[in-house]
């Protein structure tokens, strides 16, 4: 196997949970295929805890591999001819995945580590961490796609983003050409001043020369300011455009996508737009000027002294190489900084969201130490990057000194030998002094480009993911929902439930009960089309398959009160309307008609009370009342209530139950509850979810006649 090919196709993980899919993506790229971490995360069922070997097996088969799982030994692993994924246990019992490419009799096993890179491990070293002896072999079959389609799509996506900026960017480039040419004015004038003007003692020539130089330098300043303004305008437009497009893509991704992502990482990737724009500005400003300065400087050096020009031309590649050879280390260090930054952001958010638990359990010291560790790792990555930059600075600085001294010594000898004049020496030194920074910038240009490339890939992974479907049959009413032989599992996980059958009709309240974790809420989310089921069918009005209905028209007809209520920054009215424009009379009529007014009048400013992060703290019951008002204002024809009254007091719950009885003739209601005592008088049918399937169903009187989860509650 070609080591360079392996190193070039190896993929580093974006966070700790990515190690499994990063290994799979490395093997895909090794075989000249293409995919993305986000797509593999979704298909494999990767969660914040990571990926199962089953999940990797399932997605590998989907992507055109012959995948086989084994529990084997080191000797057999050494005989594998194709790269395989192995499950290892690192220090502190941390579960991890590695790619084993092949075995070399002298060097050992060639390992691709998504956390560190490519390296060799001896058989004993690998055996020490490979505790489970589990591995997944992967061999591409005829269905495996080898194409550069993804690269073309990335290019098209990026070009579409900057297409509107072409005019401003080209103007900036042309102005950069003028600025680069004017940059030589001082060196040329210095040479003329020393060699011609001052020796001739011609005041008129001196004044006119200084006047011309002043005009050129002022023109350079003016053009630079104008150019910066154009780039500033482009920066604003581009950042708005890419942020809007990326955020819009994010909002239209399937709900399952957000289940496997930390908020801090999503925020960090939204901020990646700044890195991309910085590089665009760099390419259209500094890069253009540096290239032109380098070319023009070399031309002038050859003009003053072809020997000095030749020495510079031969020496600069060495100077360039000294800087360029550090690129790989810098790029790897930059990647680690970005990963640790995202992890640190996530830790902040996670800690702040759990502040009540932390305080109640007196765990401030624990989380303080955790933050210190996470932030310390982040700072350590920044420190390591800084050390590389310092090392690069002194190496390039040393090379610059030797090069400048060499040119100074050689040109001084030329002056002694009267090969060049003193003014020409001064001009040469001035040109060389401006040439070296430009060469250094060109040598380092790949670093910000690769940083932006990493940021771009991180953004494109989200932007290119398959959005929720848009087409389908438009419906205008929901009379019934019929679930037949429904089975479901999360990707890479065991079957959650199987052969579920139930019927929900308008005019009835259908409840489902079962142990925690049995899949009741997941079933509710399947009915919302947040997840795709494995087998079976869900029919609407006994006519349309749920997945064949246009998603927007379906969700316009349903309403949901979830377990976790989201209260947005704004007033109570804002949280009910969610952007709808209505007259005050209309909303007051709704609030009064449904009986919510007394509850909202208890708040400090009534319906105008500011709630959310910037407002008052609401109790769980108050949040549920707002959520109930929000969903009923929508006038749904299919209502899903997931523990919708769990935080309410007795009177508020009684009010909610009476409200459901009132609206029941107009819609079908699916009620998920652990509070079984509330179902006795309100539920028309109750389904019992036990042992991964529906074991019993009927009304209260029917269910208590048999032995089941529901009847056991009433017998206690």
Model-derived features with residue positions:
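Transmembrane helix-loop-helix hairpins at lipid-water interfaces of multipass membrane proteins
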Residues: 170-223, 230, 302-307, 419-422
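ABC ATPase nucleotide-binding domain helical subdomain, centered on the C-loop/LSGGQ "ABC signature"
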Residues: 548, 555, 573-613, 666
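Loop segments that connect adjacent transmembrane helices in multi-pass transporters
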Residues: 244, 248-265, 336-386, 390, ...
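Membrane-integrated ABC transporters
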Residues: 1-186, 199, 203-208, 231, ...
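ABC-family ATPase nucleotide-binding domain "signature/switch" substructure
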Residues: 522, 559, 564, 572-575, ...
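Helix-to-loop junction immediately C-terminal to a conserved catalytic motif
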Residues: 528
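Cytosolic ends of transmembrane helices, especially the final helix of ABC transmembrane type-1 domains
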Residues: 340, 344, 359-363, 387, ...
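Transmembrane helices of ABC transporter permease
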Residues: 211-220, 224, 286-335, 407-420, ...
